[in-house]
Structure formats: structure tokens, C-alpha cells
Amino acid sequence: MSKHELSLVEVTHYTDPEVLAIVKDFHVRGNFASLPEFAERTFVSAVPLAHLEKFENKEVLFRPGFSSVINISSSHNFSRERLPSGINFCDKNKLSIRTIEKLLVNAFSSPDPGSVRRPYPSGGALYPIEVFLCRLSENTENWQAGTNVYHYLPLSQALEPVATCNTQSLYRSLSGGDSERLGKPHFALVYCIIFEKALFKYRYRGYRMALMETGSMYQNAVLVADQIGLKNRVWAGYTDSYVAKTMNLDQRTVAPLIVQFFGDVNDDKCLQ
């Protein structure tokens, strides 16, 4: 047992079973089913498609008409604009496992080998969100044969083998069967919550903090991906139970929260 390893049995000992049951019940209300090969595309929005643009990229004023706003000079802005999310991914070019490792260690691990602080905040330093690496393309160099799903250990900076499912089945589950829109990404990260780890200290509040932590994590991955030349897209259009089963995850303990695809976006080459 490594010095960083935590037994879930210990965490479960301090978890209120009633809180756990209520949070799980609430969580599954957000589960989704997306299998386009069996049905039309599923839309959860009540807004007609023709009207959606009216609601996108807008601001809400809390006191409209009652007070004038104070403008801030755009000269203060020194950050770069976020690159657009990738679509129509293409795996024509080989991707080295070294590039993937570079993403993982810079997005989720400290540059100081002796530090336990990660690049994103976590309530109570509990870090209840786990990152799983899923290979989706055979066009990856130096990937160890036999395993296509790994669990990333950010303190050890190591990969734990989890599942041996083939890349086609894995991509079908993560994409919700909607691979035509996405194209051919090289790999994906799946962010999963360990319920007991999120709840044992802060109870219901811990669930909220875990969801916010997930956003910090994938935004960090966005920033690193931009720097190393990877395109990415955050994706929620998948069937939760199907993803968990394909990845060999015990849904009584852990659940996928969001998927993030990575790779090249390479014009028309993959459409030929």
C-alpha cells in the first residue's frame, strides 16, 4: 500500500447512509439516455430549436432599468481567448502517449514531486473526483497493449489499469452513439465522482463542492490542451449506466459526471 493510498472502507465508515441515499437519488435524476441508432436525437430542452439562439451567449441584469452599469476598460485584459471546442475530430495523425502524459501531469498533478497540492482547489483537500483515461483510437504510439481504460493517480503520477474493452465499444458508449458529429478523437478523459469520498465530511455540501471541482479540473485540462496543441470538447450526451458498465466501474460507489474528448481537428481527411 503506497503512502498516498486511501481505503474506501475507511471513508464508508464515516458516511451517513441516509445522506448517501438521498444524494444518489438526486444524482440519477440527471442521468441521460442517448442511443441515436434506436431513436431520434434526444433533447432535454423545452425550448424550440428555432428559439435557442435567443438564449445563448447572453447576460442577465439583476436590476434592469434601475441603475447604469460601470464600464471596465478592455485594456485590462491580458489573457488569451479560449480556443473553440473541437468538433469533427480526426485521428489520421499518430498521437504519442507522451503527449497524453504531458496533459495529465500538467492538468492534475503538482510540478513538485514532494507536494500533495494539485493545480485545482478541492473542499477540505478531499479530491473526490477521479480521472479515467480512455483510448479511442488505434493510432496512438507507445500505448501499452491490452488495456484501454486507465485510472490516473495524480500524486503517484501513474496509470492504474481498469478495463480492456476495445476502442470501438468504448467510443460508442462515451459518445452516446453519436460519433458522426464528433468524428474520431484519439482519447477521452472521464471525470467520475466517488460518492462516499464526496459526502463523508461535508455531507450534502460535499456533493456541491465535488461538482464545482469537476469544472475546475476540465477547465484546467482545456488550458493545458491549448498549450500542447490538442483540441478538446466537453461532452454530456452519453448514457450514464452504459459508460460505467463499459469502463468496469461499480455504480454503487462511483459515477461518471462528464466526458472530455481530445485529439486533432483536421479538415476533411477523416471524411474521405
Curated annotation (Swiss-Prot):
InterPro entries: Bacteriocin_Proc_Enz, Nitroreductase, Nitroreductase-like, SagB-type_dehydrogenase. Keywords: Antibiotic biosynthesis, Cytoplasm, Plasmid. It holds the Pfam family Nitroreductase. GO terms for biological process: antibiotic biosynthetic process. It comes from the Bacteria. Its main location: cytoplasm. Gene3D superfamilies: NADH Oxidase. GO terms for molecular function: oxidoreductase activity. NCBIfam families: antibiot_sagB (TIGR03605). This is Microcin B17-processing protein McbC. It comes from Escherichia coli.
